[in-house]
Amino acid sequence: NWSWCSGSGEGCDYHSECCGERCCIESMCIGDGVACWP
């Protein structure tokens, strides 16, 4: 569950985490910016 973001975290809302080029939406960033889980 993700959407695009910038490296600064811009574009992620309060319950999202910037993970590389994507926002992890209600999930966590794993693999040093590789993927969102779950």
Curated annotation (Swiss-Prot):
Q: In this UniProt entry, which cysteines form S-S bonds? A: C5-C19, C12-C24, C18-C29, C23-C36
User: Where is this protein found?
Assistant: Secreted
Output the superkingdom of the source species. Eukaryota
Keyword set for this entry? Disulfide bond, Ion channel impairing toxin, Neurotoxin, Secreted, Toxin, Voltage-gated sodium channel impairing toxin
Q: Which residues form the signal peptide?
A: none
Drop me one GO molecular function for this one. Answer: sodium channel regulator activity
Describe its function.
Answer: Iota-conotoxins bind to voltage-gated sodium channels (Nav) and act as agonists by shifting the voltage-dependence of activation to more hyperpolarized levels. Produces general excitatory symptoms.
> What does the comment on domains in this protein's record state?
The cysteine framework is XI (C-C-CC-CC-C-C).
As for family, the record states: Belongs to the conotoxin I1 superfamily.
Any idea what this protein is called? Iota-conotoxin-like L11.5
